[in-house]
Amino acid sequence: MYNFTDTNEILKSYEMGIQTTFNGKTLERELTNANGAFQTVMISGRGVVDQEHQTVDVTGRDGKVFRRKSYKEREIEITALISGINNSAFRLQFEKLNELLDTNEPSDLIFGDEPDRIYKAQFESADIPDEESNQQIIKLKMICYDPKKLTNKKTVTGNNVNYAGSKETFPKISFIVGVNVNEINLLHVEQQKYIRLKGTYIQGNRIEIDMKERTIKLNGRNELKNFDMVNSRFFSLQKGANTLRLTPSSQLTVEYSEVYQ
């Protein structure tokens, strides 16, 4: 029979501590109730990301020749206290935790002390000690195969985007065609890259360009058949000023997340 744990203090204090939200569900809120509690205690892995270096050996040359770098996946470890008021409640806590961690693809991982950053994480494993009482300190290992972190979606209306992220981001850009036309050009002035469409477009048509997925839609339908693949280039937003020029002119809506390392 497990010892009884008074969860009153945890119930009072979890709102003030570091909360863990995964796939839209806050673990403290889902697992803290009259039958037990969950409290994030410590998080590691949110700092510097390790790099991998590609090098080449050259005969007769000291050392190696550096070619390029890439970032390794980010490993985040969540240390937490989980408890139940009795044996049965304790087992139910773990059933619920398993359910909350079960996703088929990397999902949003957000921490209460860093609410404006989103990690794309997949649960990998748990370090759980032998059950000697109805409360335990456990460790949850989350893998971010893409080590970068994001902000919530931002929307800018107009031709100028002042991008604050430290890494490039690929926006979604949409607009309503203002006049009947047979060619549309969307230019990123600083990069001198553009999207060119050659087709029949009438006033009121809606064009949506997804730079990440490399899709173009006209009124919700695939429009890549009229995409100038030879000369066009999908582009990103870079840190600082990003000036967009649409011909013929129309109001642009730019949606993006800021990306940080």
Language-model region placement:
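Polar/acidic, low-complexity leader/linker segments enriched in S/T/G and N/D
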Residues: 1-54
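Intrinsically disordered, low-complexity segments enriched in serine, threonine, and glycine
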Residues: 148-261
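Oligomerization/assembly interface segments of phage tail-like spikes and tubes
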Residues: 61-88, 134-147, 242
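Short, acidic/charged, Gly/Pro-enriched secondary-structure junctions
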Residues: 4-8, 19-21, 79-124
